[in-house]
From Swiss-Prot:
Residues annotated as signal peptide: 1-40
Lineage of producing organism: Eukaryota, Viridiplantae, Streptophyta, Embryophyta, Tracheophyta
Family membership: Belongs to the serine rich endogenous peptide (SCOOP) phytocytokine family.
Entry coiled-coil feature ranges: none
Name of the protein in its database record: Serine rich endogenous peptide 21
Keywords carried by this UniProt record: Apoplast, Cell membrane, Cleavage on pair of basic residues, Membrane, Secreted, Signal
Record-level Gene Ontology MF annotations: LRR domain binding; receptor serine/threonine kinase binding
Quaternary context: Interacts with MIK2 (via extracellular leucine-rich repeat domain); this interaction triggers the formation of complex between MIK2 and the BAK1/SERK3 and SERK4 coreceptors, and subsequent BAK1 activation by phosphorylation.
One GO CC annotation: plasma membrane
């Protein structure tokens, strides 16, 4: 078996080997996650070509309305208001 000799890391110990594997795995996941979030950014381009690139189309925001319906539940006993 290949033996690695480092003064500060002894990979022949099971705990240190697990630690190094976990550290490398977490580093890989962190770095690959950073590239994925860069690709997932929303480009703020208008859907209307007359307005141009990187401009918010205000018509979209004016058409989006949030409606909150009143609750159908009754108030409990003893509650006022």
């Amino acid at each position: 078996m290949l033996e690695l000799h480092f003064e500060f890391i002894d990979l022949n110990q099971p705990k240190m080997y697990k630690f190094v594997v976990c550290l490398l795995t977490l580093s890989f996941l962190l770095l690959s996650g950073l590239s994925n979030t860069a690709l997932a950014r929303v480009h703020h381009e208008s859907s209307n070509p007359k307005i141009g690139n990187r401009v918010w189309d205000q018509k979209i925001f004016n058409n989006v309305k949030v409606r909150v319906l009143p609750s159908a539940s009754r108030r409990g006993p003893g509650q006022t208001g």
